[in-house]
């Protein structure tokens, strides 16, 4: 089972919230106190909630479900991309396009366009075009890759969202809520936990904290997938023995 511990969270600075004047009262029950006008998050509360979220993700991955990793702000984007790719999950690291979930039909058409352009770039079609046309298509390809590259292999709506900074990704959460897609989210002291099914109270800015969340989630996914593969192997091995007994 995927687990994080208190020491890891303290080292990563998960407990440092935002300045006290920016607090959201809805996060009050997760705040331990304040130090130098900075709210301190109660990690005794965070620990079980974080681990519950990891268990949920591991279970989803074991069932071959897709978890969409979402983190488009500068401090999160690169890590989101790396960790999602490492565990084979879709991601949005650049900008959330309105309708990415609620208007998936249109998004699917854009993904098809992206795939077509990728093929053209590889099969020599670009070389046969005028310089201007080739440049325009290259720019199109770059733009689409930046916006949709992380979800081009998603193959349909995700089964859950994992979000870094729920304020920054509020549109994504609203869309998931409309469609009944569960949301796992890191919620800092200045944010609202509304619309988040699995709340992880914690610092959503510090690079080390963001790294910890994403690394732990990726590990949970990998463990879930490995567990599913192992049990599938065991099932195959045991099946003939059972039928032989019958």
Swiss-Prot record:
Recorded hits in InterPro entries, A to Z, give: Ribosomal_uS2, Ribosomal_uS2_bac/mit/plastid, Ribosomal_uS2_CS, Ribosomal_uS2_flav_dom_sf
- In the record, what terms sit under GO molecular function? structural constituent of ribosome
This protein's GO CC annotations: cytosolic small ribosomal subunit
Record keywords: 4Fe-4S included? Answer: no
Q: Which domain of life is it from?
A: Bacteria
Q: Which UniProt keywords apply?
A: Ribonucleoprotein, Ribosomal protein
The record's Gene Ontology biological-process terms are: translation
Tell whether NAD is among the UniProt keywords.
no
Q: Which Pfam families match?
A: Ribosomal_S2
Q: What family does the entry list?
A: Belongs to the universal ribosomal protein uS2 family.
Q: Which PANTHER family match?
A: 30S RIBOSOMAL PROTEIN S2 PROKARYOTIC AND ORGANELLAR, SMALL RIBOSOMAL SUBUNIT PROTEIN US2M
Q: What is this protein called?
A: Small ribosomal subunit protein uS2
Q: Which organism is it from?
A: Pseudomonas paraeruginosa (strain DSM 24068 / PA7) (Pseudomonas aeruginosa (strain PA7))
Gene assigned in the entry: rpsB
């Amino acid at each position: 089972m995927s687990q994080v511990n208190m020491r890891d969270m303290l080292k990563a600075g998960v407990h440092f919230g935002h300045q006290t004047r920016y607090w959201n009262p809805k996060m009050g029950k997760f705040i331990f106190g304040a130090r130098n006008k900075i709210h301190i998050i109660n990690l005794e509360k965070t620990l079980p909630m974080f681990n519950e979220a990891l268990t949920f993700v591991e279970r989803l991955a074991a069932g071959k479900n897709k978890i969409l990793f979402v983190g488009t702000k500068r401090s999160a984007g690169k890590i989101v991309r790396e960790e999602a790719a490492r565990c084979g999950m879709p991601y949005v690291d650049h900008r959330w396009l309105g309708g990415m979930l609620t208007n998936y039909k249109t998004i699917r058409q854009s993904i098809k366009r992206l795939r077509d352009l990728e093929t053209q770039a590889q099969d020599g079609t670009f070389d046969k075009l005028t310089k201007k046309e080739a440049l325009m298509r290259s720019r199109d390809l770059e733009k689409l890759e930046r916006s949709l590259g992380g979800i081009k292999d998603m193959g349909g709506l995700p089964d859950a969202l994992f979000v870094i900074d729920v304020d920054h990704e509020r549109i994504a959460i609203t869309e998931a809520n409309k469609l009944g897609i569960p949301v796992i989210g890191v919620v800092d002291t200045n944010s609202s936990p509304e619309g988040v099914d699995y709340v992880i109270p914690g610092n959503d800015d510090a690079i080390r904290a963001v790294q910890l969340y994403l690394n732990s989630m990726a590990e949970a996914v990998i463990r879930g997938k490995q567990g599913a593969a192992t049990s599938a192997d065991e099932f195959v091995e045991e099946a003939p023995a059972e039928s032989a007994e019958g």
